[in-house]
């Protein structure tokens, strides 16, 4: 009998997965993968489908994604219509054991349409704006949602996940407090954005979005609309256009030439800026805005 247990111990030491297999977590976007890594610690292995610099609304569904998700235990969706392509990946994975989590649950959603939504309004999300992670105060909400899901999949470590989620929520609060001081030192926080991606960020840090380069969400800028923005920029001394890297730079160049507006090109998700983690990315966006001449 002793020899039997000795051999089992040796197998566990040589092949760690035989004794302690990690929970595999797939996430639609890198921010959710980053938060899940903080919550899961050594018990999880996380990967994201969409790259940080990609448009998370439009991801090509590849068979390789389905294969990866077929081996996952948990799939984290952004929700609110952000990543509807996730459904095709989940269905194609044929993974009946997969726990699917809507990470928007519990978040205070902004920009819910008051009435019916139609095509004339552009790419409007009927359940509200889906870019909630750009307010770091929502990071703790998401962390707790992820911890609850991981605890259901792996009850033996449920307390660990909950503890790490609370620690992460505290980190989010501390990071927000520090970054809010940076934001409050910016004298003019009236900005343009290319797309309606930044309301949560603006709400968190006291920015006012005076207009978008797109006349309506998803519709490219028109000459008349850009001319209107030039007038607004001059009258309100707007110095910044916040733009994602996958949009054309033409509108930004026009606004800079005609009104001195500078483009700050930043991804919506972590790993696309200088800093790799969720909170570090938000910090990097804020510091990039503070560094613009005329803003600080």
Residue ranges and their predicted role:
Residues 8-9, 19:
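Cleavable N-terminal signal peptides
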Residues 14-16:
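N-terminal signal peptide c-region/cleavage motif recognized by signal peptidases
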Residues 20-296:
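Extracytoplasmic metal-acquisition and chelation regions
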Residues 1-8:
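Bacterial N-terminal signal peptides that target proteins for export
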């Amino acid at each position: 009998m002793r020899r039997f247990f000795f051999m089992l111990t040796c197998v566990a030491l040589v092949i760690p997965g035989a004794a302690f297999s990690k929970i595999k977590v797939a996430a639609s976007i890198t921010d959710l993968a980053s938060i899940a890594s903080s919550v899961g610690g050594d018990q999880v292995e996380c990967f994201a489908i969409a790259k940080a610099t990609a448009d998370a609304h439009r991801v090509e569904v590849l068979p390789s994604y389905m294969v990866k998700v077929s081996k996952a235990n948990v799939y984290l969706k952004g929700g609110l219509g952000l990543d509807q392509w996730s459904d095709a990946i989940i269905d194609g994975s044929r993974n009946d054991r997969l726990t699917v989590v809507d990470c928007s649950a519990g978040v205070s959603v902004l920009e819910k349409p008051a009435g019916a939504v139609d095509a004339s309004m552009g790419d409007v999300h009927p359940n509200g704006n889906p870019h909630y992670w750009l307010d770091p105060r929502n990071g703790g909400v998401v962390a707790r949602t992820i911890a609850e899901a991981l605890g259901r999949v792996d009850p033996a470590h449920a307390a660990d996940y909950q503890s790490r989620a609370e620690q992460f929520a505290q980190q989010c609060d501390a990071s927000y407090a520090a970054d809010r001081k940076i934001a409050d030192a910016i004298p003019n926080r009236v900005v343009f954005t290319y797309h309606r991606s930044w309301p949560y960020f603006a709400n968190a840090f006291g920015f006012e979005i005076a207009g978008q380069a797109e006349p309506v969400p998803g519709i490219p800028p028109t000459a008349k609309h850009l001319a209107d923005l030039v007038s607004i920029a001059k009258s309100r001394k707007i110095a910044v256009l916040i733009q994602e890297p996958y949009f054309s730079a033409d509108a930004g160049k026009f606004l800079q030439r005609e009104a001195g507006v500078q483009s700050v090109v930043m991804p919506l998700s972590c790993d696309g800026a200088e800093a790799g983690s969720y909170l570090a990315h938000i910090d990097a966006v804020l510091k990039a805005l503070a560094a613009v001449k005329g803003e600080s």
